[in-house]
Amino acid sequence: MVKITINGQCIETQENNTILQAAASAGIRIPTLCYLKDINEIGACRVCAVEVEGYAKLVTACNNRVQEGMVIHTNSPKAMEARRTNVKLILSQHDSNCAVCIRSGNCSLQRLANDLGILEVPFEKEIPENNWDRKFPLQRNAAKCIKCMRCIQVCDKIQDLHIWDVAGTGSRTTVDVSGNRVISEADCSLCGQCVTHCPVGALHERDDIGQVVHALADENKITVVQIAPSVRAAWGEGLGISQEKATVKRLVAGLRRMGFDYIFDTDFSADLTIMEEGSEFVQRLSEEKESKLPMFTSCCPGWVRFLKSQYPDMVDQLSSAKSPQQMFGAIAKSYYAELLGVDPASIFCVSIMPCLAKKQECAYPVSYTHLTLPTILRV
């Protein structure tokens, strides 16, 4: 243990702690932007810069360890001025049109600028152009990127796919798809971790709400929606609604008021997936040497993309059963269309799910014409 002083408060902390960790343990908040515990501790944003007595320069709190007798000032005039300047420099290369940003109200940079009282940016704006495939489920806006490197570190250290990398030099340094590739040709599994850890609106999922609204307004369309179990269980959290009020009945009632004709739970098609995969597994076991084992589930499109790109020699071990989302779509466009006596093309299926990869999965070309039900349920 070492003894240090932060903002006049004497603190005893672990010897290997960073200044940021020591301050947090004492209830002292030091603002950060790029910091991600154990993943991204590079001090790139310089927002966590603090003043240490005896040091000629400010030091970043996220990656500098405490030392015995340190006297630290987190909000000294020198530290605050540097913090404001660093944020202003970041804003000079950031599209600050917050009113139409997907992260408005939930943006780390926006909150930090407000906390620091930044009302104007004295530096000349240098906003990079945004060239991105608008059809791809994962969307990136280069004009919003603050070069925090979180996406790179998360993809490298957690997913180990190395999709992102640093591109350019000097003031033109940015983040882009590694290997000078376009995102659709990269090995991205669409896990969504880079989106989750992006502190601003630079990374986000493709917005398909417009298509849904258009379908709901079309009198010739029969709208069918399926709700994933995880969404059913947690939909109220994002809206600040208690578990007692965020019931399934209220969720269904809300979808009804929006105009959906038929509402289903993905539990149904998940059961179909289990039955199909179980039957296939028994069949593979009976074939002995003719089948490759173990058999892997195919219910997760992110996992399927990962296996195909990283372990192509194991593709034959994937189950041929569709995922629950695909099975529901197949049933809706075949059996259910026949039950309703309507043209399958008039049915518009909507999936409310927490998975980015499912946006790509639902775009796969599939034909259900003249197929038997067992065939429809298989890939």
Predicted regions and their residues:
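Eukaryote-biased recognition of intrinsically disordered, low-complexity regulatory segments
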Residues: 1-7
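N-terminal cofactor/phosphate-binding cores enriched in small/glycine residues
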Residues: 11-68
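Fe-S ferredoxin-like electron-transfer domains
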Residues: 46-190, 196, 203-218, 222
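Cofactor-cradling patches in redox/metallo enzymes
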Residues: 51, 80-81, 234-244, 251, ...
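Glycine-rich beta-alpha junction loops
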Residues: 66, 105, 158, 229-231, ...
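Extended hydrophobic secondary-structure segments that form protein cores and membrane-embedded regions
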Residues: 226, 295-297, 348-354
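Conserved small/polar residues in nucleotide/adenosyl-binding loops
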Residues: 369-375
